[in-house]
């Protein structure tokens, strides 16, 4: 079993990964010294979760290459987010499924994902305290187990092509306090932990609609989230010329 510290490991998410799949954050995530960044948030959700359901169109250079159908709903005493994404590319189609379970305070409990395309892969992740244990299954290979250790139990799961998960990041942001706020994150399909910094850009008008904008960034890149009340309606990754738009 390999153990990795999320506080010291250099990490990245490819803007465009194999088979034309768009990386979850479309960012490069790099860990930096604790002295140079704000400490990751360890407090629970600022805004309560609400049930939601919808579809995101995935566009690159203005052309739709896929879509995600998602739902966020209560699951007993916890909450579940289910996402199903289909991506079309010259190398073939890719189908991704992700299921995330979090406590009401936003702390993750369990996550599983699977992908079918040129190759099949799947994984389950169990969160216990500050440790995330991943069991990865790759087609034609033996199962592989890896552990990641974080500074605190509060970790945001942001996986490839499952954009509804950014809803949880927006809920964790303290809108009253505003300013830069740093969060520990895990990108399961890339097996990469790291941190992101989130800041409020304020109210914007997009296509005649008033929305709140959050900027998610690292030292290398950024992605903009647009929210109508508590609903995530748009994501923009300028460096990848990509947009994720709610239908």
Model-predicted regions and their roles:
Residues 18-28:
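Bacterial N-terminal signal peptides
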Residues 35-51, 65, 118-211:
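Solvent-exposed helix/loop surface patches that form functional interfaces
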Residues 51-52, 95-96, 198, 219-221:
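Short, small/polar residue-rich loop motifs at catalytic or cofactor-binding pockets
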